[in-house]
Amino acid sequence: MPNISIAFDLYGTLLSTDAISDQVAEMCGDETKAKQITSLWRRYQLEYSWRITAMGIYRPFADITEAALKHAAAEAGVPLSTEAVAALQRSYDALSVYGDVEQGLRQLESERREGGRDVRCFIFSNGTAAAVSASVASSPTLSRYAAVFEKPPLSVEAVGAFKPASAVYDHLVAEATASRSGSGGSGGDGAVGVDDVWLVTANPFDVVGARASGIKVVWIDRAGTGWIDRLGEVIGTDIGPTHIEAGVHEAVLRILYSYV
């Protein structure tokens, strides 16, 4: 069986940002406003990353996240102190995993230990390598399975652009297919073919960006809405996920069973 590489998006795929709304509510004292701020924060976080990439400029994701939070709070009419902004920024280093994640990581740990092939796993994120490493270290679940993932994590900072820029996915493919000495599995040298690189993500923009670059993708559809993104139709190739699953564990099984 071939060696395979599986990349996992971090924020919103492995780690849940749902608890952030509760922290915002504690600070502003209004649950409705807190939900509005949290929703706008994520919206502007992504929008800013896309805009700055389109301008050919790069700044760390933490800087964009902070600016997006200030924008969201201002739009909601809720003043946030410098201390509150800093505290909410730190919340990204204290996120919990989704309930479907640990079983998937346990499956990968078993596969890497007992399987007859090399399964390389990466965290692939808009965050800097340092920020991603901090998030993993502070997560009780991810830190317990840290050995499952290659180090350092794959960050877009290496190419100075954010998802879904094509250069980001080219970087993923280059790293995920690189040979490494001393690897197990049937490949001998640890080499992975381009056709055996997978991305697991809950973000539709990530799906379309990766598929446009020829990467297989399992989309995590926790809301059960089905695939409704239509940008693939605009591109002209009707791009969509390779597979759709309800959680990370199901995604891992789908990928591994594709080679049975």
Features from the language model and the residues they span:
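Alpha-helical elements of Rossmann-like donor-binding domains used by nucleotide-donor carbohydrate transfer enzymes
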Residues: 22-23, 40, 67-71, 87, ...
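Substrate-recognition element of Asp-dependent hydrolases with the DxDx(T/V) motif
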Residues: 83-94, 101-140, 152-156
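An amphipathic alpha-helix signature
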Residues: 21, 25, 38, 42, ...
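A metal-dependent, Asp-based hydrolase signature
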Residues: 35, 43, 47-88
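Active-site neighborhood of HAD-like aspartate-dependent phosphohydrolases
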Residues: 1-46
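Asp-based, Mg2+/Mn2+-dependent phosphohydrolase catalytic module
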Residues: 124, 128-260
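A short acidic, helix-capping loop that chelates divalent metal ions and anchors anionic groups
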Residues: 23-24, 49-54, 227-228
